[in-house]
Design a protein with these regions (language model features):
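Amphipathic alpha-helical segments that line or abut small-molecule/effector binding pockets
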Residues: 64, 88-99, 175, 179
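Hydrophobic alpha-helix immediately C-terminal to the catalytic Tyr-X-X-X-Lys motif of short-chain
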Residues: 20, 24, 28, 58, ...
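Catalytic helix-loop patch of NAD(P)-dependent Rossmann-fold dehydrogenases
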Residues: 1-38
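NAD(P)-dependent short-chain dehydrogenase/reductase
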Residues: 26-81, 87
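Substrate-binding strand-loop-helix patch
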Residues: 49-55, 79-92, 107-127, 180
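Mid/C-terminal beta-alpha module of Rossmann-like enzyme folds, strongest
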Residues: 66, 93, 97-151, 188-192
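Short-chain dehydrogenase/reductase
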Residues: 6, 11-19, 52-60, 83-84
Length: 193
């Protein structure tokens, strides 16, 4: 479980860049250049559009593609656990953060947002509940060592007590994340039912 005050030791350049951004935001807020708040997002799924080369792309792909009736590749074991929120929640996080009083946030300006911590297997079962067995049949397991080496080092669950106390909210389960995608991006209709 990763807490807001967890000592970060990034293992990638991307993680290092994110940490540097958080430190600059905190310092510039402390110095009065602006009143900032850093939003630590969980992995956002289901992202609209086409798959990309990001190591995390499959988290959206194994839901998005089957909902469109297209095959998706699962490059990691179903036992992988990760924390997610929908694009709808991400927008809500940003809007809510913009309205917060800096005094309520305090000197620790970077806040871990809430999300749903689930295994890939749980994601797939949520897809089955929401869209049916035909959608799940479109997921092909094809291990990719390069992606696995990256993903296996990612934190799996986060403590978002502070964010929740400040009024941030996200979905309570992965079914709701899938339903938000269907409502927001597919006009409420599923292609692979």
């Amino acid at each position: 479980m990763i807490h807001d005050d967890f000592q970060q030791t990034p293992l990638t350049s991307y993680g290092t860049q994110k940490l540097v951004g958080e430190l600059i935001l905190a310092d510039y807020t402390r110095r009065g250049f602006f009143d900032g708040v850093g939003i630590r997002l969980p992995t956002i799924v289901v992202r609209p559009g086409k798959p990309n080369k990001a190591a995390s792309s499959f988290f959206s792909g194994i839901i998005r593609e089957p909902l469109a009736g297209v095959e998706a590749i699962l490059p990691v074991p179903r036992s992988v656990v990760h924390t997610h929120a929908s694009p709808r929640s991400a927008v809500g996080f940003l809007i809510h953060a913009a309205g917060l009083d800096g005094a309520a946030i305090g000197p620790r300006r970077n806040i871990t947002m809430p999300g749903v911590g689930v295994s890939v297997g749980n994601q797939i079962e949520a897809l089955r509940r929401v869209a049916g067995a035909d959608a799940v049949k479109l997921i092909r397991e094809e291990p990719d060592e390069t992606i696995w080496k990256i993903v296996q080092n990612w934190p799996t669950r986060f403590d978002a007590k502070r964010a929740k106390a400040l009024g941030f909210t996200a979905e309570e389960n992965f079914d709701a994340i899938i339903r938000a995608y269907i409502e927001d991006e597919l006009g409420g209709k599923v292609g692979a039912r």
